[in-house]
């Protein structure tokens, strides 16, 4: 484990209660990485409870997929131990970055369960270092394009700034932003909510 990573939530369970033969780190094609982090939320708290709620709900769903006519979990889904770095947003981002990059190098499809938006910074950084011409699709009400907020560039309001600088960022559903973010956004890659509800969209 990379220096700076703190593991607080360990699990012996598998995702959605799938058989253990499909939930091992070695055989799984997919890694689910819980990051119950809520350190920079500035209005409502509670995003840190998301991963646990998601995992509990997963145990009550059907595992057969109608669209693919298959049981997709048989490709293997590994539920990794949660990263819960609480000391600072900088250390959390580094922890996520190191862990995600390690799994990518092991040829795993990494999916994170959060957590507030700042957890995306480390993951996007890891993917952009491993893949050329990366496109990031952001579905969100806010652009999160501030270079810094409340003294940190790792704040939830800055979650997409680095992605804008290093990847092809496409933002969909935007309905609220700060004026300063209009100066850095790529207007051709932003789809505002009020435009999407029109008949001409």
Residue ranges of predicted features:
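Short, Lys/Arg-enriched N-terminal segments with co-localized hydrophobic residues
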Residues: 1-8
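Conserved alpha-helical scaffold segments that buttress catalytic/binding sites
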Residues: 8-201
């Amino acid at each position: 484990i990379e220096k700076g990573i703190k593991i607080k939530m360990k699990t012996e369970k598998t995702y959605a209660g799938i058989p253990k033969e499909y939930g091992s780190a070695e055989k799984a094609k997919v890694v689910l990485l819980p990051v119950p982090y809520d350190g920079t939320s500035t209005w409502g708290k509670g995003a840190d409870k998301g991963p646990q709620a998601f995992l509990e709900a997963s145990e009550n769903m059907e595992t057969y997929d109608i669209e693919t006519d298959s049981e997709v979990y048989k490709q293997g889904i590994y539920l990794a131990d949660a990263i819960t770095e609480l000391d600072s947003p900088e250390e959390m981002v580094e922890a996520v970055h190191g862990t995600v990059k390690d799994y990518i190098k092991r040829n795993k499809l990494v999916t994170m369960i959060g957590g507030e938006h700042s957890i995306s910074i480390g993951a996007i950084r890891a993917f952009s270092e491993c893949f050329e011409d990366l496109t990031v699709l952001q579905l969100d009400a806010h652009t999160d394009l501030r270079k810094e907020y409340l003294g940190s560039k790792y704040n939830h309001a800055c979650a997409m700034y680095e992605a804008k600088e290093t990847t092809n960022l496409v933002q969909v559903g935007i309905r609220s932003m700060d004026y300063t973010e209009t100066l850095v956004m790529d207007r051709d890659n932003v789809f505002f909510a009020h435009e999407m509800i029109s008949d001409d969209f």
